[in-house]
Amino acid sequence: MNEEYDVIVLGTGLTECILSGIMSVNGKKVLHMDRNPYYGGESASITPLEDLYKRFKIPGAPPASMGRGRDWNVDLIPKFLMANGQLVKMLLFTEVTRYLDFKVTEGSFVYKGGKIYKVPSTEAEALASSLMGLFEKRRFRKFLVYVANFDENDPRTFEGIDPKKTSMREVYKKFDLGQDVIDFTGHALALYRTDDYLDQPCCETINRIKLYSESLARYGKSPYLYPLYGLGELPQGFARLSAIYGGTYMLNKPIEEIIMQNGKVIGVKSEGEIARCKQLICDPSYVKDRVEKVGQVIRVICILSHPIKNTNDANSCQIIIPQNQVNRKSDIYVCMISSAHNVAAQGKYIAIASTTVETKEPEKEIRPALELLEPIEQKFVSISDLLVPKDLGTESQIFISRTYDATTHFETTCDDIKDIYKRMMGSEFDFEEMKRKKNDIYGEE
């Protein structure tokens, strides 16, 4: 371990593993350590089930009705992948896809007036949907056609809207869309957690709706993918990539000290040995004095013996509860998967509800989601701090990832990865460029 590295990475969460893989592909010498004996950090999948009970300090062993403990892989953080999103692109460009199998999630649902409705995934479904009335549907369709044709680099597609200036509120007004449709569009399609976006320039929202539509177009049932055996497979896939390109991995390594000189990181001390480095990437748990808390997320993992009511017995789905349906500022999400994904015993379902904490009683806040899941066989409640780095790391060369937010997809995580990459390398992260570098350094496949 007493060696020189270009980059040392602490923690094997998804952000850290992807960056470690990318740095190795870029020809950098990487050492990757984690104090835990397992991969994934905050974004791990826990197996066997007994370990989940221990982690949440639930007394006794899981009952026999839960099946074999090792049939379970329970994600601590619930997220899906957008089929056409940034994470899938990263998986494809790095060829990490060869280590993973994905299934399309069976449906996306939205909560309205105490009931859940399927988010239409075809024009026929949209016409038949009871989410909106007939005239509303026509206006909504016109809006979707506009979005599909929109190209921020081609002013001919703007139709009088300035993507950098016109607010989304004005765009909705132009198409004469009602409040219900606005809620649905902003929260179930553009996947915003709050309504702050309404007064921002519309370009970002239109592109988010395009991402949803393009992801949906890929597989037809829903825009979401989920890996067999759980999300813990993702960091492991990128860790393999890093190892193939010469990265060194060490799990179960207690980190004693991050060594600084003149305000800059020069190495990491573990078990009495020092590994030297020029740059350090880590999650907030390794540098508690360099991060600040900006909020909290509550997540409740629920084990069920039945599919969720009114979802056509889907073996996987997402439910979005828009904030103003339950008088909140931020949406509540439910991600549900099952034995079909090799993450639960036969006939069992895992539903994870999550939201941004807004009051002193987070468990009360998440109740509307739990009511949709009853009866619940066992629940595991966690409240996590949302931590962000206090500075950009340019002085110290310590680059800290953000904790995982309450969104149900990885787009914000990928934004963080690209942001850290840019700060470390001084250039934008470019998929094509990465592919070329890989071929230059390691030859064509």
UniProtKB/Swiss-Prot annotation:
This entry's Gene Ontology molecular function terms read:
GTPase activator activity; Rab GDP-dissociation inhibitor activity
Q: Write down which residues bear the modification named N6-acetyllysine.
A: 112, 269
Give residues where N6-succinyllysine occurs. 57
**Residues bearing the modification N-acetylmethionine:** 1
Q: Which residues carry this modification: Phosphoserine?
A: 130, 382
Subcellular location as annotated? Cytoplasm; Membrane; Golgi apparatus, trans-Golgi network
Answer yes or no on keyword Acetylation.
yes
Q: What biological function has been recorded for the protein in this entry?
A: GDP-dissociation inhibitor preventing the GDP to GTP exchange of most Rab proteins. By keeping these small GTPases in their inactive GDP-bound form regulates intracellular membrane trafficking. Negatively regulates protein transport to the cilium and ciliogenesis through the inhibition of RAB8A.
Q: How does it assemble?
A: Interacts with RHOH. Interacts with the GDP-bound inactive forms of RAB3A, RAB3B, RAB3C, RAB5A, RAB5B, RAB5C, RAB8A, RAB8B, RAB10, RAB12, RAB35, and RAB43; binds RAB3D to a lesser extent. Interacts with DZIP1; this interaction negatively regulates the interaction of GDI2 with GDP-bound RAB8A.
UniProt record similarity statement: Belongs to the Rab GDI family.
State the protein's name: Rab GDP dissociation inhibitor beta
**Originating organism:** Bos taurus
